[in-house]
Amino acid sequence: MNISYYTIQAGLNPAVGFGYAGKNIVKSLNNLGHAVSFANPKSTIQLNFTQPHHFKLHRSQYQIGYTPWESTSMRLDWVERFNACDEVWATSDWCAQVFKDNGITKPIYVYPHGIEDIWKPRRRVVKEGQPLKFLHIGEPSPRKDGQLVVDTFIKLFGGNPDYHLTIKAHKFNTTRVYDKDNQFGSPEIAYGNITLITDELEETDLVSLYHSHHVLLYPTWGEGFGFIPLQGLATGMPVISTYDWSHYMDYMGPLKLKSKLTDETLPKAVGDEHIGKMFRPDAKHLEELMREVSYDYKAYSGYYFAQADKIHEDYNWDQLTKKAFEHLVEKFS
């Protein structure tokens, strides 16, 4: 089948979610024998994978509108653009329900993202003399709440060499703390057991970063899909994350982080303003889970490692893509 793929220029960058997902969508379509071109009005179908106001809707072409979203409300012009498509795709059941609740009337299908083989499971142990290493990825997005991670880590383990926190930021970091001299600055300057990484990493280096850490901390207010927790889970890593938004919540396990659906606004210093409600992470529960996993790491490590192979089976890109396009293959064959 001839398929046109469309996104904006920024959506081609594999260092961000749209680009990373898009790369794998196109690759899996090619693996399945489909011919994929870019913004081609002559193709039978066009998959628009970007924010709805950027959709490129050619006439006389079957149009699919596909985007992730993180809150309970959407812009009215987004709803109009979705309804101008022939069908709409969502990245999770939660996201699909949000689309329906906001007035999208076209058929809605769920096409979750997948995981690549490179995210291999690894059994993790804390060796004698080695610190328990926590990892947070997502700065500078306020939605990923890196500040909550830093504040909680310092409260529990600040300055304790038996514990370490790595903050992996995309180019820059917004988390701030006061040091012993009451100076306000970046946490890795004030605490010797906190490390900051701002460089963009190749995928192999990113996988190695996951493999070299013991616990992923991800108190997000919501995700369109949530690659970061899925990648951690696929490597067998214990993950502390909110989950109500998640397509893969069944794999979140005993470290699921409680949250509350609220209309409290996020900080607006970085990123787009979100309207509607989002899932505010429970700060006290995050503290409890971090203590719990540090007390009994061996048990949690075993639990999450044991389910990793099943995650790779359920979130295989080729299988997910084949299922998503089955009704279109039947319709246009």
Give the location of each predicted region.
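Aromatic "clamp/platform" in nucleotide-sugar-dependent glycosyltransferases that forms part
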Residues: 221
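Nucleotide-activated donor-binding/catalytic signature segment of Leloir-type glycosyltransferases, i.e.
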Residues: 177-207
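Extended catalytic core of nucleotide-activated donor transferases of GT-like folds
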Residues: 33-103, 205
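Conserved donor-binding/catalytic core segment of Leloir-type glycosyltransferases
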Residues: 127-144, 150-153, 165-167
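N-terminal pre-catalytic "stem/leader" segment of glycosyltransferase-like enzymes
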Residues: 1-45, 49, 327
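A charged, aromatic-enriched C-terminal amphipathic alpha-helix characteristic of glycosyltransferases
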Residues: 17, 277-288, 295-326
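Short alpha-helical donor nucleotide-sugar binding micro-motif in glycosyltransferases
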Residues: 207-213
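Short hydrophobic beta-strand element within catalytic cores of glycosyltransferases
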Residues: 238-242
